[in-house]
Every structure is written in structure tokens, then in C-alpha cells.
Regions:
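Active-site residues of response regulator receiver
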Residues: 9, 54, 81
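Two-component/phosphorelay signaling modules centered on CheY-like receiver
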Residues: 12-31
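Acidic, metal-coordinating helix/loop segments flanking the phosphotransfer/catalytic sites
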Residues: 32-50
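Acidic catalytic/metal-coordinating carboxylates
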Residues: 35, 61-64
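The feature encodes the CheY-like receiver
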Residues: 58
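Short amphipathic alpha-helix used as the core "switch/output" element in two-component signaling
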Residues: 63-74
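Alpha4 helix (beta4-alpha4-beta5 surface) of REC/receiver domains from two-component response regulators
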Residues: 64, 83-101, 105-113
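A short, hydrophobic beta-strand element within the central beta-sheet of small alpha/beta folds
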Residues: 74-86
Length: 116
């Protein structure tokens, strides 16, 4: 079964690139969200298997969203950011996310490996 993914990022051009990348690898992008409120609503409405979640959102940081999803036994979360992983280290593990990928290194293979 193909994994269903929600993409959360406040930059629409990045969401378009991520959608193309994931769909070309066989993922089904259920929806996109530009902020935390939209993301939480989309998770409730669409029940995705995974969320590709930006750390820096306009209304709430991605760590808080990932923590809320983990507490609710929600979908797997992979965090992304334009900053490098060493900036976030322990926070990624503490929020219940499966891992972190810098946006410059995003690939369907890396995303999939973190979901396994």
C-alpha cells in the first residue's frame, strides 16, 4: 500500500517541489498545509500515514506540532528545515519525530528510510 503524506511548509514553492518528489516516488500526497493550524486540521480530516513538517511555521514551531501529534498517537513525522541538523539535535528526538532532513538534502529515499 502506498503511504499517504501531508506536506507542511509555509512556502508554497517548496511544497510544490516536495509534492513532485514524493509523488514521483509513489507516495500519495493527501494535502498540503501552510501553518500548524492547517496541519492539525488536515491530519484530523485526511488521516495521513506520515507528515513532512517544516520546523519553522508562522503560527507554531514544528517541534510543538510533532509533540502534539505524537501525544495523540498520530502519523509518523519527519521534520525539515533550511537549517542543518546540528542546530536541532536533541529537540528532534524529544518531540517524537522519526528524524530530520535538511531541505537541501530532501529525497524520497531518505524520507522513506526514516519511515521504516
Amino acid at each position: 500500500m502506498r503511504k499517504r503524506v501531508l506536506i507542511v511548509d509555509d512556502h508554497q514553492p517548496f511544497r510544490a517541489v516536495a509534492r513532485e518528489l514524493l509523488e514521483s516516488a509513489g507516495y500519495v500526497v493527501t494535502s498540503e498545509a501552510a501553518d500548524a493550524a492547517e496541519a492539525l486540521a488536515a491530519v484530523a480530516a485526511d488521516s495521513p500515514d506520515a507528515v513532512l513538517l517544516d520546523v519553522q511555521l508562522p503560527d507554531r514551531d514544528g517541534f510543538a506540532v510533532a509533540t502534539a501529534l505524537a501525544a495523540a498517537d498520530g502519523p509518523a513525522v519527519v521534520l525539515i528545515s533550511s537549517r542543518e541538523a546540528d542546530d536541532y539535535g536533541r529537540r528532534v528526538a524529544a518531540c517524537g519525530a522519526r528524524g530530520f532532513i535538511p531541505k537541501s538534502k530532501l529525497s524520497a529515499a531518505t524520507f522513506g528510510a526514516l519511515l521504516e
